[in-house]
């Protein structure tokens, strides 16, 4: 039995199957019954009108957090929230596999999204007066010049979506020439291990940099401050594993990342930072997810680190058990100035949902309801008109699209069933 909504009749969450279309119809019914426009409802809930339109037209489902807010706002007595969660959960109405007799509409497929991302990033590429590609800016809707870090993000995004559209070799060679004595610096100058890690990753993947030189650059970008920040350690470890999983630097980074955990009610997890003098720090979803992703990278190449497996499994279970929404967060990095005159404050934003999706997709046993919840939050930030992912402020940060497509690729490969996975796969 499939739920229906005709006129003012509500859609029941107790029906045998519930789809995103059912959620959209019910949300539209409730909004009209309240006498609100899309813009008014979106403002009350704290999302964009485009988000609400996507929910009502069944493009995406609201996250658990937004579903709860909508339910409370329309006084739906938990019915709307249950409807969203039912639509998000695995049901018998899954789309036919590639080998079935049915025909699948690919106009809204992940493949098409990836094609769109590649084409849109190619449009945002900055060129000089002679047409030579220079790179990308950090915030794609601004009118600033290209940066080393954002160009590395753009190259890596093109590699993930699989359609370069541009000459990546020329970009990579120019990016290589931008290095300084301590690797590649960000806008504030000084040592920036996260910047160097992203650039080395892009250059190595485009065969512009050797593994040995990459490891040397990673080593030179680190300092004692890096050991207190799980974000920095996990970013550098991710690249070091790609270069050489058994390198001495890789082992040191693994040990440092494991040492950065704190005990939270008997579970060893990652906070935003681990330094002396902290008062009641909390476990961080995004830092734990980022660390898990880096450690799973290690486990794909190494079987001699049981401590890594135990740490990843423990943290993954905590991520699965989390019931809060996977909203984006910001982190302050206070780095010493290159001239020694004080410090420079750097704001790092994290696309939490994308990292949770990656962490779950790499788990030995994938919990689909939890994955679907994180994916719902991820898709809420996709702007179909731009073909890219948008931060809540309205910015178009290139790194957010990289995180999104990387997560979606991992999830798509993880949940593939026969005939897109080996016969006999459960």
Give residue spans per PLM region.
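Short alpha-helical segments in extracytoplasmic peptidoglycan/chitin-binding modules
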Residues: 31, 71, 175
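DNA major-groove recognition helix of helix-turn-helix/homeodomain DNA-binding modules
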Residues: 63-86
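A short, Lys/Arg-rich alpha-helix, primarily the initiator
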Residues: 1-34, 81
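Preference for long, amphipathic alpha-helical scaffolds in soluble/luminal domains
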Residues: 94-426
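Short alpha-helical DNA-recognition segment
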Residues: 32-54, 60, 64
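Intrinsically disordered or compositionally simple regulatory linkers and C-terminal tails
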Residues: 5-7, 14, 90-101
